[in-house]
């Protein structure tokens, strides 16, 4: 089991999954590098563990991931792995690279998402050694109805560092055991790697909402940033005739058949022109305000 680098792989429309994955990967690399960051030892003697980032938010690509420890993170939508994340993770292939799977949810529950993510990574050829659930600000969180607002926060990032350090210890222990074992013993060691993950098979049914973010034309300046940040390309700048029929007006619209309600456009619009009014915001604020904490399990 060769580990020459640590790669954070994530689908992260609103930035929370990416922030968590990179923090875990950084802590893992620092621990494997003797407590120093890659930058601190990049000019020193020896071969430091390299760090890579594979952000699949705006598009996936077929890629072989080998000789790497991967931190694979995805958001939870309706108790499942975000469908677009699942599609893009399936494009990755590995020949037994160890990984940690991380489900990021908005303080309600991750339901079957974590076990689904672990299954998905196994199908791609990865070897999950750890599974974690972390909390990120809910996509439906608003100023009026905050849900896990500004998470991951400093306490969450401390947990990321703790998780990353523990991952490094698990990898080092496994590498040591494998290096001292014969071929038959290695097979036994690998067969004994089991993860205790909450969730059900078959997974719960995913039920997407038909609603989609709208545009406040009084605030929108037609800058097109929402178009650029949409992970599924569902936002367009459309032209239509005005009331007099003499000129053409332009407006930003989403295709509800494609929109995944990730709310990247809502949170990313610098003018507050993208709005998603859903009764779930108030419901989640009312019922899911008690702070939940990250949890994880290890295969060793």
Protein language model features and the residues they cover:
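FMN-binding flavodoxin-like domain, especially the glycine-rich phosphate-binding loop
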Residues: 1-20, 26-54, 59-210, 277-300
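Iron-sulfur cluster-binding cysteine motifs and their immediate structural context
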Residues: 215, 225-253, 264-281
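Histidine- and/or cysteine-centered catalytic micro-motif in compact active-site loops
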Residues: 104, 218, 240
């Amino acid at each position: 089991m060769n580990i020459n680098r640590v790669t954070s792989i994530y689908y992260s429309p609103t930035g929370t999954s990416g922030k968590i994955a990179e923090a875990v990967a950084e802590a893992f690399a620092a621990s494997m590098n003797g407590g120093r960051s890659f930058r601190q030892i990049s000019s020193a003697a020896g071969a430091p563990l390299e760090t890579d980032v594979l952000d699949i938010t705006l598009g996936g690509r077929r890629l072989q991931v080998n000789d790497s420890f991967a931190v694979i993170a995805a958001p939870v939508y309706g108790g499942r792995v975000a469908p677009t994340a699942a599609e893009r993770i399936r494009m990755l292939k590995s020949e037994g690279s160890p990984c940690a799977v991380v489900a990021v949810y908005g303080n309600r529950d991750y339901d079957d998402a974590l076990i689904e993510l672990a299954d998905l990574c196994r199908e791609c050829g990865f070897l999950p050694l750890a599974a974690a659930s972390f909390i990120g600000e809910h996509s439906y969180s608003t100023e009026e109805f905050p849900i896990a607002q500004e998470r991951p926060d400093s306490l969450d990032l401390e947990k990321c560092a703790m998780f990353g350090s523990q991952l490094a210890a698990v990898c080092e222990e496994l590498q040591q055991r494998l290096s001292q074992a014969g071929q038959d013993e290695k097979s036994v060691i690998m067969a004994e790697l089991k993860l205790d993950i909450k969730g059900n098979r078959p997974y719960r049914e995913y039920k997407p909402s038909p609603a989609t973010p709208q545009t406040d034309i009084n605030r929108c300046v037609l800058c097109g940033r929402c178009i650029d940040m949409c992970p599924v390309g569902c936002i367009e700048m459309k032209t239509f005739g005005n009331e007099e029929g003499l000129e053409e007006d332009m407006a930003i619209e989403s295709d509800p058949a494609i929109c995944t309600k990730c709310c990247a456009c809502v949170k990313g619009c610098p003018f507050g022109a993208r709005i998603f009014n859903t009764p779930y915001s108030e419901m989640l604020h009312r019922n899911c305000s008690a702070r939940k904490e990250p949890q994880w399990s290890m295969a060793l």
